A protein has these predicted regions:
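Interfacial segments of transmembrane alpha-helices in multi-pass membrane proteins
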Residues: 2-4, 404-405, 409-424, 428-429, ...
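Small-residue-enriched core segments of transmembrane alpha-helices in multipass membrane transport
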Residues: 12-15, 522-544, 555-562, 623-638, ...
Length: 1005
């Protein structure tokens, strides 16, 4: 063996690096166990702060360096944030209001929502249509782009400046998000910009148990504003007039030339009206019987018909508070106050915003204040903004209530003094991200640049708010377009199931290798598997990549790849021994002859893994990461490390009589002369019929699409007692109603076998960008289940807590926005197509014959169609979910990777025989090549199926669908190598297939 020194050096370096990085996990566990012996929590923390691992690394360093666990193993939160590129463009254009710009923005938004695409390109195309003959510089020669865009700039120069500014905004947003998470104290967060998805940032936060806080913190743009306000008495008459107009059927569709006159008349009418004062109170009456409930509903409907606005909004409150409303009515009120009628009736300089917290002066819960802000600038922006804030602290006021104190720079202090001096006796509203946090009365001029945000806050609220302000302002609003929350208890169960499936699969593989290849070769292969796991975990830890349940599956599957390499080598050694060579020569020839097949099969699998890593998100990336590492490590351990050991032993005249078979495997598929090429017409017919059935099933039954492809929310609810999915569907049938009055689509399927775990899916308000919709959906779910006596939790907070299992609770949740669903759909299609194209090209380059590329690609396409077809035929008929989600797409790509591995081995033997017998009969040559690799095919398929069955049975629900798809892929991928790929390659070679004689065909070799 050449280059032994390099192999030994790499092995030693990998060993030392793996020991070093894995040692942090053991150190952390040791320090935790020692700290647990200390009863005082403060003393516990002091002990952890004092430790120094290896004399250098603190306890926090150990936490951050130890092997990280993903959300499904540790619990936590995964979100994808989308930075609003349209808002960035509006900021760059200084919020221009000319028709060309606004129409172009509206058109670009509509096109992006319908078809996706690059928003900047969509906007520029729309602008050229809506403002023909006008240059982009007319819009973007602003203060924000000073030095980059001038009135004389060409459209190309402006586009370049816009794209640069958009990318800068995304980069700044990424930095702000990272700073906020660091201040929150999340250990081992994973924050990354998603390549190829402009404006999207993925954030993984293991161990997070307060998703509501994280949602607020991540989506807050820290857009702080100080506004002058109206008094409530000034605005009440306008709201009464608006209520009357809406009740009389005014829909705002009148002609434009009548608007001015109508507005003037409205103001005169309002001027005559006597302001109506209302006390700030809410009375909530409880009705016990069903008849009272029906009567109450009828009264409410009549009241809303007579007073669409004021039946929902109670006027009064004083200062800037014009009224109060229940949180459930805010959407309907917003629809009225932002309507075309409201634009004609309400003052043009009025801006109505809700309070951030429920009113603290009312006994009723979930009642919010509506504040009246006065626009005093020509641009419509606040007279004082958050860019003047230099510091923010969470403190307590004189009454002991939590507040946030802020300091301003010199310019901000000057403007603040002017603003407070001009508004003595009135309120100044402090607005953050479009909601009013406080609106205190100004008693006198405030100099020195000090201000304070007070309200109905908790200590956590003020701490998060101060951290958000200190982290900096987001250049554009960010919203969560995809979210997954996993409870820690569910994570612990996943760890247990993952470890059990891993250990059982590992033991079965070890037993199988010894059973098929005898003690010494079998144990050598098993030793390589152990080293494989050790190196994989070490490399994974050094990359600070989180280990997930799909990641564990990837590691287990990579063991199958390692076994395949050993099987190829051992089968080759057996062939050389049967040909009469000595042990040393047979081992050398076996490793040498198997190298090309191992290299090609591993590289094609690696191509698939890289595509998974690039196109996948969340669990798919975790699987791809460990699979890629496992493929590389298995190649090194199987091809080089085991060779070192064999060479060492054989050079010392040991293992000279080692056996590579057992009574079980001695004659396995030896001397077989199956005439596979004679069957191609039959097998092609069967394949075509199967394809027709599968395609027909797509049209008749379709596929069970998950929210990854439709958009929506999933809630995995664990009940105290067994329930039926149909019962849940009935209970939730009318519960989720969208803001426009339409029923949301709702579904329920059973998870697991205990009958107590149900996954509820709904597309309720999935198009809405409001941060309150998530809480609304969870509240609706709780109320519906509570009313049906299916859960006994006393509050929605307890129901949302994944650790409070008694009484029923949400143990995990997922949200996928519609834009993400479209991107996932297109990404899935592109990733599969790209994988097929990449493999086609690689096979063409390596085998230098298009026949092998065509044969493998057609067979791979059939493999993918077969797996998808079975999912279409079987969903709803098997006792586990067969939904099409991102994990399933990962399974399809993995099937492609495994299947091409098998085909490459067969094609490699055909290529070898073609070189040995260039003028031999092609039909006999193909048959002989397939027969010669049958033993390897059976051993590899069997060992891989053992692994997959362990994952499917023991690995848990989250990867059962994945493993089932892989089982189908292994079975049909193996068959397609023999009955589709090889005959197709033979046909494309251009040789006419001759009918074989009935008698035995002599083997080519």
């Amino acid at each position: 063996m050449q280059n032994k020194g390099i192999v030994i050096c790499v092995a030693v370096l990998l060993t030392l690096a793996s020991i070093f990085y894995l040692s942090f996990s053991f150190a952390t566990r040791y320090y935790d166990s020692e700290a647990a012996k200390i009863k005082d929590p403060i003393a516990q923390q002091d002990y952890k702060d004092s430790v120094k691992y290896l004399g250098v690394y603190s306890y926090q360093n150990c936490l951050e360096t130890q092997i990280g666990l993903g959300l499904d193993l540790k619990g936590g939160m995964n979100v994808i944030l989308e930075i609003s590129v349209p808002d960035v463009l509006e900021n760059l254009a200084d919020h221009k209001t000319d028709a060309g710009f606004t129409n172009a923005m509206k058109e670009a938004r509509a096109q992006e929502e319908a078809n996706g695409g690059d928003f900047v390109s969509l906007f520029i195309n729309a602008y050229h249509k809506s403002a023909p003959g006008h240059k982009l510089a007319e819009v973007f020669a602003t203060q924000q782009l000073q030095g980059k865009v001038s009135p004389q700039s060409s459209d190309a120069e402006v586009e370049k400046a816009i794209r640069t500014s958009v990318q800068d905004a995304i980069n700044n947003s990424f930095n702000v998000v990272r700073t906020r998470i660091d201040k929150f104290g999340v250990v081992q967060p994973n924050i990354q910009k998603l390549e190829g998805q402009q404006g999207r940032i993925m954030v993984e936060m293991p161990g997070i148990s307060q998703p509501e806080r994280m949602r607020k913190m991540l989506q807050g743009s820290a857009n702080l504003e100080f506004w002058e306000t109206y008094n409530s008495e000034e605005i009440a008459p306008y709201l009464q007039q608006l209520d009357t107009r809406i009740a009389n059927g005014d829909n705002g569709q009148e002609e434009k030339d009548s608007v001015a006159a109508d507005s003037t008349a409205a103001k005169k009418e309002v001027a005559k009206a006597e302001p109506k004062k209302a006390e700030a109170k809410f009375s909530i009456k409880k009705k016990d019987d069903a008849a009272s409930k029906v009567g109450e509903d009828a009264q409410n409907a009549a009241a809303i018909k007579a007073h669409p606005l004021l039946a929902r909004l109670q006027l009064g409150g004083g200062l800037s508070t014009v009224g109060y409303a229940s949180v459930r009515d805010t959407a309907a009120i917003n629809k009225i106050i932002y309507s075309a009628v409201a634009k004609r009736v309400l003052p043009s300089d009025l801006r109505l915003l809700w309070s951030a917290k429920p009113a603290d002066n009312l006994k009723a819960k979930n009642i919010f204040e509506l504040h009246a802000l006065k626009v005093t600038t020509t641009t419509g922006r606040a007279p004082l903004e958050g860019d003047v804030i230099t510091d923010a602290k969470d403190e307590f006021d004189q009454m002991g209530s939590p507040v946030v104190s802020m300091k301003m720079n010199t310019e901000g202090a000057r403007k603040w003094a002017q603003m407070t001096k001009a508004n003595v006796g009135k309120a100044i509203a402090i607005v953050l991200d479009g909601v009013v946090y406080s609106a205190p009365r100004v008693n006198g001029e405030i100099d020195g640049g000090s201000s304070q945000i007070s309200g109905n806050f908790t200590i956590e609220d003020t701490k998060d708010l101060a951290n958000t302000l200190k982290s900096g302002r987001m250049p554009a609003p960010a919203r969560i377009v995809q979210e997954e929350v996993v409870g820690p208890t569910l994570g612990a169960q996943s760890i247990q199931m993952g470890i059990v499936s891993f250990v059982v699969a590992f033991v079965l593989l070890m037993v199988y290798m010894v059973m098929m290849y005898n003690i010494i070769p079998g144990m050598m292969a098993n030793l390589a598997l152990l080293v494989n796991v050790f190196f994989t975990l070490g490399i994974l830890t050094s990359f600070q990549a989180a280990l997930t349940l799909p990641g564990l599956a990837g590691m287990v599957l990579s063991l199958g790849t390692a076994v395949d390499a050993n099987v190829l080598i051992y089968e080759r050694i057996k062939e050389e021994l049967r040909s009469g060579k000595g042990m040393k020569q047979a081992v050398a020839a076996g490793y040498g002859n198997a190298f090309s097949a191992i290299f090609d099969s591993n590289l094609t699998s690696l191509i698939t893994g890289v595509i998974l890593l690039i196109t996948g998100t969340g669990p798919i990336r975790g699987f791809a990461t460990t699979w890629i590492i496992g493929i590389v490590v298995s190649f090194f351990t199987a091809v080089f490390l085991t060779r070192l050991v064999y060479d060492y032993k054989l050079n010392h005249d040991k293992w000279m009589h080692c056996k590579f078979d057992t009574p079980v495997s001695h004659n396995l598929m030896q001397g077989k002369k199956y005439k596979f090429m004679s069957m191609y017409k039959t097998t092609f017919t069967i394949a075509i019929v199967a394809a027709v059935v599968f395609i027909g099933s797509f049209f008749v039954r379709g596929l069970s699409k998950s929210i990854d492809f439709t958009g929506g929310r999933n809630y995995v609810v664990q009940f105290e007692n067994p329930v039926e999915p149909e019962q849940i569907r009935t209970v939730l049938g009318d519960a989720f109603v969208n803001a426009d009055g339409t029923k949301a689509t709702t579904g329920a399927i059973a998870i697991g076998t205990d009958g107590k775990t149900i996954r509820v899916s709904t597309n309720y308000m999935i198009e809405s960008n409001s941060p309150t919709v998530d809480d609304e959906a969870e509240t609706i779910l709780y109320n519906a289940l509570k009313k049906a006596n299916l859960v006994s939790q006393k509050s929605v907070e307890a129901f949302k807590n994944p650790d409070v299992r008694q009484g029923g609770s949400i143990i995990s949740s997922t949200k996928v926005g519609p834009s993400v669903a479209k991107d996932i759909t297109m990404g899935a299609i592109y990733s599969v197509l790209f994988a097929l194209i990449a493999i086609f090209l690689y096979i063409l380059i390596r085998f230098r014959n298009v026949a092998f590329s065509v044969g493998s690609t057609v067979a791979l396409a059939f493999d993918a169609l077969t797996v998808i077809g079975f999912y279409s035929l079987l969903w709803g008929l098997v006792p586990f979910s067969l939904e099409i989600d991102q994990t399933f797409i990962g399974a399809i790509l993995t099937v492609v990777g495994y299947s091409i591995n098998d085909k490459v081995v067969v094609f490699d033997r055909i290529r070898e025989n073609l070189k040995l017998h260039p003028k031999g009969d092609r039909q006999q040559l193909f048959n002989a090549s397939i027969n010669e690799t049958l033993a390897r095919t059976i051993n590899t398929s069997t060992s891989t199926l053992l692994v997959l069955l362990c994952i499917c049975i023991l690995g848990g629900d989250s990867i059962r669908s994945f493993s089932f798809a892989m089982i189908l892929g292994v079975v049909f991928g193996t068959l397609s190598s023999i009955f589709i790929a090889s005959p197709m390659a033979y046909i494309v070679l251009g040789r006419k297939i001759k009918e074989e004689p009935a008698e035995e065909v002599a083997e080519v070799k």
